[in-house]
Every structure is written in structure tokens, then in C-alpha cells.
Design a protein with these regions (language model features):
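Rossmann-like adenosine-cofactor binding region
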Residues: 3-97
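Short acidic alpha-helix initiation/capping motifs at coil-to-helix transition points
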Residues: 1-3, 121
């Protein structure tokens, strides 16, 4: 997606290709839907081009970032940190690695919270409570070790 050049000029914006953007930016923040064309829009190649002082923020959709490549880039010091409100697979070892990385902040899909969203979540929360009350197994638990420890 690109705005009309007149609108970009009006907003004092300069369009640059993605590779140039990741090279120049101090902060890369993703705000696109997850489509075939946007899956892993940030991968090893883009991460390798980022400044070591730059941060990556993804509050849009898991799958936009190649989480394995992100973890490796962070471990190698290729970028300063990441803020993630979504990951590709909450139950993966890669996500655990990201969670254990000190320069990564992960939140549980709350970046887009609104009153309407809160109302829509009530049935899901009720189902989780019922599953727990019946001794069932929960899906998508990020910190399962605390659940198992009764904390």
C-alpha cells in the first residue's frame, strides 16, 4: 500500500522501499494484515539490514515476522530489541526463547484492546473458566510452567 504522492507530501512523508526503510529506521513498527504477500515480511534478510540500535515492534499479526530469524538476530546483537504483541506460534520453543530474551517484551495480544473487543472476549473467558473448572487442558498458554505450579 502506498499513499498518493500528494498526500505523502502533505504529511511530510517520504516513501522508501522496505529494505531501505529497515536500514534507516530506529524503530520499525508493523501495521499490516497477515496475507501470503506479508508473511515473514520481516525475515533474516531485513533483520540483517537493521541498525544494531534499532527496535522492531509487531502489534499487528503473528507471522509477519520470522520469529526464528528474530531470535537469532537478537542473540547476535543485530538489533537492540523487540516489542511483540503477537508471535507466530505461542507454544513453540522459539517463542520461549524470545520470552527468555531480556531485550524482548511480549504482551498477550492486548495492543489493540478496545471496549468492543473486551465485550467480544467475554464468551472466550467464560469458556476458559469452564474448562479450568472441569479440569480440562487449556490451549495457547504462554507461561505453562506457572500454571502447572499453581501460581
Amino acid at each position: 500500500f502506498r499513499m498518493a504522492p500528494e498526500r505523502e507530501q502533505e504529511l511530510h512523508m517520504t516513501y522508501v522501499p522496505l529494505d531501505e526503510l529497515v536500514e534507516r529506521a530506529d524503530l520499525v513498527s508493523l501495521h499490516v494484515p497477515l496475507l501470503d504477500s506479508t508473511r515473514h515480511i520481516i525475515g533474516a534478510e531485513q533483520l540483517s539490514r537493521m541498525k544494531p540500535t534499532a527496535c522492531l515492534v509487531n502489534t499487528a499479526r503473528g507471522g509477519l515476522v520470522d520469529d526464528s530469524a528474530l531470535l537469532q538476530a537478537l542473540q547476535r546483537g543485530q538489533l537492540a530489541g523487540a516489542g511483540l504483541d503477537c508471535v507466530e506460534d505461542e507454544a513453540s520453543q522459539v517463542t520461549k526463547g524470545l520470552t527468555d530474551t531480556p531485550n524482548v517484551l511480549i504482551t498477550p495480544h492486548i495492543g489493540g484492546s478496545t471496549a468492543d473487543l473486551a465485550d467480544a472476549m467475554i464468551p472466550t473467558i467464560a469458556q476458559i473458566i469452564q474448562t479450568l473448572a472441569e479440569g480440562g487442558e487449556l490451549n495457547n498458554v504462554v507461561n505453562r510452567e506457572y500454571l502447572a505450579a499453581g501460581q
